[in-house]
Amino acid sequence: RSSATPRDSIDYPVFDGSVQYKTPRAFTLPTNPGVYLIHDFRGILYIGEAKNIRNRFLQHHRNEENTLLKELVKYPFGDLRFYWLNAETKLKAVKIQKYWIRVFQPITNNIKYNKDRS
């Protein structure tokens, strides 16, 4: 049995924070690497990773290339939130992102990972 606590395990996400998905909230976001997700009452809409969480949040607002995500955040169901988990390195963030996409299968992630391809 693993001695990892839920905080150390990617199986049990414990987020470092969340904000409403609005640009004025950007100043509260960290500038370090991490994994993030965008969520409303439908569930997890998108999972991403970033070397700078704050900059990536702002990029989603300025120039969203994912047309489905763009449409869903324009017309959210209930409270639209941005959650993040700090990661020590970008490599760790990528690993967590791939795993979460496989497990949670968000509807707007274009890349889907399975056990054979990581």
Regions found by a protein language model. Name each.
Residues 53-99:
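Conserved short loop/helix modules at catalytic or binding sites
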Residues 59, 101-108:
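Short arginine-rich
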Residues 1-51, 55, 91-96:
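GIY-YIG nuclease catalytic motif and its immediate N-terminal context
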Residues 105-118:
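Coupling/hinge elements of helicase-like and P-loop NTPase modules
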